[in-house]
Amino acid sequence: MDTLFRLVSLHHHHHHQHAASPSPPDQPHKSYPSSRGSTSSPSSHHTHNHTYYHHSHSHYNNNSNTNYYYQGGGGGGGGYYYAEEQQPAAYLEECGNGHQFYMDEDFSSSSSSRQFHSGTGAPSSAPVPPPPSATTSSAGGHGLFEAADFSFPQVDISLDFGGSPAVPSSSGAGAGAGAAPSSSGRWAAQLLMECARAVAGRDSQRVQQLMWMLNELASPYGDVDQKLASYFLQGLFARLTTSGPRTLRTLATASDRNASFDSTRRTALKFQELSPWTPFGHVAANGAILESFLEAAAAGAAAASSSSSSSSTPPTRLHILDLSNTFCTQWPTLLEALATRSSDDTPHLSITTVVPTAAPSAAAQRVMREIGQRLEKFARLMGVPFSFRAVHHAGDLADLDLAALDLREGGATAALAVNCVNALRGVARGRDAFVASLRRLEPRVVTVVEEEADLAAPEADASSEADTDAAFVKVFGEGLRFFSAYMDSLEESFPKTSNERLSLERAVGRAIVDLVSCPASQSAERRETAASWARRMRSAGFSPAAFSEDVADDVRSLLRRYKEGWSMRDAGGATDDAAGAAAAGAFLAWKEQPVVWASAWKP
């Protein structure tokens, strides 16, 4: 008997024991095969004594006041259920203390993991707690939410979460999507999509029942399914309570408080060491920029030698406008390449990095100041004349005054490159106009690296209510696909216990809350597909510049350094369904699924 069927059956069994619970309709229960079996996650066994948070726990088993027991196996890795006391204030804020998010060391509920014997997957005889109801409290606080959290105020989708979870209904939104996932599939995607359809269909009973199931199964310290369920459940809860922007601000503030140069550096370097997710775009973009700059430097040197015989001709000045979110980890390799591949005088390189933020951040300024100092020191070691400037821009990137940046340095700059790494998706409005403004800079090359996902949703007032609901389901499903691939790659690339992995997963949690719960006009998660970006670039007057064979070889050599599963694919076959425009550049694929797109463009 599988996990979810036992959850539903248990509710039916306890229905007669709770007078406040509504009578379920007379219909059969749906079963959901468990995908975990005996898979064990060791996350509940290690000591969380790391940079970001410090935990203090008291252990107990067979507590007389609860129905939770110690089990040695199961999807959550077994172990004792932990109390939730003495958490630091910063930890509680980042993890959503308003609803006791992430308060437990192991959120795997008794019904989702500790009810399975190790290696067999058979249910244990330990009792399972009753479903939350208006009169039932969560004694142990084992899930993401307390029972009272499932009583929502009346909002625009007319939800009323008051009683205990209802038996699955065969009618209403999401009923047709209730096909049981295969044993080899992942249960989180099935349940989360059903829940999203129920939210869009305003099926309050279905939403309530599915959210309770997800609350029982979710854990930010479990396997990929449990983590996805945890983060998306948090986003759905924030959406239903119209608290998305406030929740996101709380999470972002706590994360910013814990930010430092050392922690940022460790996370970025470890991510690049274990995953090609960011190095793929860096290598491809650097290759295109370097080839373009070397051509400009050679042309400048030839012009200088023909016009003057003086030996004091200044080096060619090159400038990069860096619109990225990778903390300048891209540039040391470019500085080294300029030093080793310049035939004559090494050109002077200037980098202007734009750091977009929702609000001015002292922590971000400290980090970028330290990064600039280290880049300047490295450039001196490489013998490259170098200058660095960080521009902190609060608000939409579309409001950035590019002309005020003086990228041409009074006409001294011989060649300008614009590097956009995960930056264009930060433009909330007027994306075509912003790309056109890049064209007016007359750059020698523009490199664009974006994650491959179609998460751009229409504004709420731009379409009918039905279209908006359909768009929510579409964006939710695409976000689930994209973040599943990302989390899966982290799962296979990082060790089970890693501070850096925890930091990256926390960022995923914030991104999911943003995507699911924030209005489209306020969301920063507005990724588009490669074909869509290619259409915008062509409309602005850019033409695709194919990566040279040398650059392609460098990328393939890079991927061989990482675990199996990564590959490079030509993006030429990807098309925009709306306009039929073909993409350009190359894809980084994880298990044959495109996840990152890199391209180069010339005016």
UniProtKB/Swiss-Prot annotation:
Q: Where do the record's region annotations for VHIID lie?
A: 268-354
Q: Does the keyword tRNA processing apply?
A: no
- Record bears the keyword Nucleotide-binding: no
Pfam families noted in UniProt: GRAS
GO cellular component entries:
nucleus
Which interval of the chain is the signal sequence?
none
Q: SAW: where is this region?
A: 517-602
Q: Which family does it belong to?
A: Belongs to the GRAS family.
Q: What is this protein called?
A: Protein SHORT-ROOT 2
Q: Which organism is it from?
A: Oryza sativa subsp. indica
Q: Which gene encodes it?
A: SHR2
